[in-house]
């Protein structure tokens, strides 16, 4: 049986929205570079210079003899760096980078990025830019099928997204715990509803925001489990959730991310499942890559968050991450 509990909107009123990147163009049709700064935290970190940076741009033919042919729109997550430079200066240097893009394959289709330009202000992000990086193609490109192999490709930066990491603490969630299952446990999940306003250009206004499209995504927080062979009631789980004092925000980690902070009391078992962290981050890049690509430049805001209490998936249920389900005939063997 599934039980759903609605959070009060005050839990995300302050930081529950992200402004759009409104596209503007030069007279020749090229996009004007822009930077967007997001701060999903409460500002209690003493050092305010840490930030997560992503670059958005166009994957295009690297042909010096003619006008470049744009193939797809992409994102290059640079990760966390520490800098006191102004966002506009960071953007200027990013637009001057010579970033080569190559399409390849491993377990799935990949995109390889590497930069050939010396770095100054972007030195804190040199690990990704100078040594190269490989990403799941569907996570960082909206149309990887359009990228050719016989023509050199480059990534031309047009937008920059900066997320200030102003919260005191760490943001990671132990990945193994996200798949953890337990007998007689109640799974605590969140169903988040976003209202999306795609960047449609300057001067264009949608009068009725209720007509804007909505999308949902779901994240797993942890499990409530009793020591004895009994199951907590839904009402008891709701009480434990209310005591946690959860506050929600939207950030730009990997595109769009859900940030959660517990300001109250958390059960010892759940606290351990979360790696003894009370500041959490769930990037949509990992949770729902299709929705994440849709939100790269869009305005979005949280309109509803619900706690979903469900029986933990039985341990005898196997999780199939592969399309091939092996049988007793041995037709598909792992080499």
Swiss-Prot record:
Q: Which residues form a coiled coil?
A: none
Tell me a Gene Ontology molecular-function term this record carries: structural constituent of virion
Q: Which Pfam families match?
A: Matrix_Paramyxo_C (PF23765), Matrix_Paramyxo_N (PF00661)
Please give the biological process terms from Gene Ontology that the record holds: fusion of virus membrane with host plasma membrane; virion assembly
Q: Could you list this entry's UniProt keywords, alphabetically sorted.
A: Host cell membrane, Host membrane, Host-virus interaction, Lipid-binding, Membrane, Viral envelope protein, Viral matrix protein, Virion
Keyword DNA damage attached: no
Pull one GO CC term from this UniProt entry: host cell plasma membrane
Predominant localisation class: virion
Q: Where does the protein end up?
A: Virion; Host cell membrane
The UniProt function text for this chain reads: The M protein has a crucial role in virus assembly and interacts with the RNP complex as well as with the viral membrane. Associates with phosphatidylserine (PS) and phosphatidylinositol 4,5-bisphosphate (PIP2) at the plasma membrane. Interaction with PIP2 triggers matrix protein lattice polymerization. Matrix proteins induce host membrane deformation and curvature necessary for virion assembly/budding.
Family label: Belongs to the morbillivirus/respirovirus/rubulavirus M protein family.
What is known about its subunit structure? Homodimer. Dimerization is critical for virion formation. Interacts with host ANP32B.
Name the UniProt record assigns to this protein = Matrix protein
What is the originating organism of this protein? Measles virus (strain Edmonston-AIK-C vaccine)
Question: Lineage of this protein's species?
Answer: Viruses, Riboviria, Orthornavirae, Negarnaviricota, Haploviricotina
């Amino acid at each position: 049986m599934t039980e759903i509990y609605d959070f009060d909107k005050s839990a995300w009123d302050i930081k529950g929205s992200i402004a759009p990147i409104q596209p503007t163009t030069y007279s020749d049709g090229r996009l004007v570079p822009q930077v967007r700064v997001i701060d999903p935290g409460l500002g209690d970190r003493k050092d305010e210079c840490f930030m997560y940076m992503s670059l958005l741009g166009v994957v295009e033919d690297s042909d010096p003899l003619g006008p470049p042919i744009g193939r797809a729109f992409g994102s290059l997550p640079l990760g966390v760096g520490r800098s006191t430079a102004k966002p506009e200066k960071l953007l200027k240097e990013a637009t001057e980078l010579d970033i080569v893009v190559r399409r390849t394959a491993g377990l799935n289709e990949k995109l390889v990025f590497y930069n050939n330009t010396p770095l100054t202000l972007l030195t804190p992000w040199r690990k990704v830019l100078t040594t190269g990086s490989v990403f799941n193609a569907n996570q960082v490109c909206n149309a990887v099928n359009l990228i050719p192999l016989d023509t050199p490709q480059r990534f031309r930066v047009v937008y920059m997204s900066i997320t200030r990491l102003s919260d005191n603490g760490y943001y990671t969630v132990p990945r193994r715990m996200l798949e953890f299952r337990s007998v007689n446990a109640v799974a605590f999940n969140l169903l988040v509803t976003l209202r999306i306003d795609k960047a449609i250009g300057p001067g264009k206004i949608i009068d009725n925001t209720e007509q804007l499209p909505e999308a949902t995504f779901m994240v797993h927080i942890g499990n409530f489990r009793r020591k004895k062979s009994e199951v907590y009631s839904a009402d008891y789980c709701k009480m434990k959730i209310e005591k946690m004092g959860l506050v929600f925000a939207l950030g730009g980690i990997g595109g769009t991310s859900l940030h959660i902070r517990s300001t109250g009391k958390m059960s010892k078992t759940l606290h351990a499942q979360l790696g003894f962290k009370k500041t959490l981050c769930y990037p949509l890049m990992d949770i729902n890559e299709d929705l994440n690509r849709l939100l790269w430049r869009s305005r979005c805001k949280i309109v509803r968050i619900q706690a979903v209490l469900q029986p933990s998936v039985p341990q005898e249920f196997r999780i199939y991450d592969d399309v091939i389900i092996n049988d007793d005939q041995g037709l598909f063997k792992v080499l």
